[in-house]
From Swiss-Prot:
The keyword Endoplasmic reticulum does not apply. Coiled coil: none annotated. It comes from the Eukaryota. InterPro entries: CASP_dom, CASPL-5. It comes from Ginkgo biloba (Ginkgo). It is a multi-pass membrane protein. This is CASP-like protein 5A2.
Length: 177
């Protein structure tokens, strides 16, 4: 008899039953998703851009007289807190080699990224509108700090772009589960 017996020749994977699909392979981790180095870099970029935008806006003495600029400050503070917390989680996951593929956690990340992206984008757009009004329409850049307003607004847009990338990648991860 030429048949192999499991006790003599162990088989690592049981043979496929007729009509049964082979087990699905997990796709390799795409950089930028939670728990990857790319994801950590995106979170750190979001944090840095939002922090610098916040710092520039707060350094202007009369920013609080314009509601859109106050909104930008509030949105960048929220973005800083969210991005820093998730950068710490990503860094910890990388250090202990844990996957952040839990569907409840991924759902929370999608909602949080979506909310912070929307708030940051709205604040950056409002600030850009006021900056254009002050600089181009009213031509009052001599009395105001147009260059600093523009820089803070541009950095808020960069932070929004990076959180949007995180949102898209995390949403894709959630949708392909």
């Amino acid at each position: 008899m030429n048949a192999s017996h499991p006790a003599v020749h162990p088989v690592g994977v049981p043979p496929a039953v007729a009509g049964q699909l082979p087990p699905r392979m997990r796709m390799k981790e795409i950089q930028g998703m939670p728990g990857t180095i790319g994801g950590l870099l995106l979170r750190l970029g979001q944090f840095c851009f939002a922090l610098v935008a916040f710092s520039i806006m707060v350094s202007i003495e009369n920013f609080s007289t314009v509601t859109a600029f106050c909104y930008l400050v509030a949105a960048t503070v929220l973005q800083c807190l969210w991005s820093l917390a998730l950068a710490i989680i990503d860094g910890y996951a990388l250090l202990v080699k844990r996957s952040l593929r839990n569907s409840l956690l991924v759902s929370l990340l999608v909602v949080g990224d979506g909310v912070t992206a929307t708030l940051t984008f709205a604040a950056a757009c409002a600030s850009a509108g006021i900056t254009v009004l002050i600089g181009n329409d009213l031509r009052q850049c001599k009395e105001n700090h147009c260059a600093r307003y523009e820089t803070a607004t541009a950095l808020a847009f960069l932070s929004w772009f990076m959180v949007s990338l995180s949102f898209i990648l995390t949403f894709w991860l959630l949708a392909t589960r």
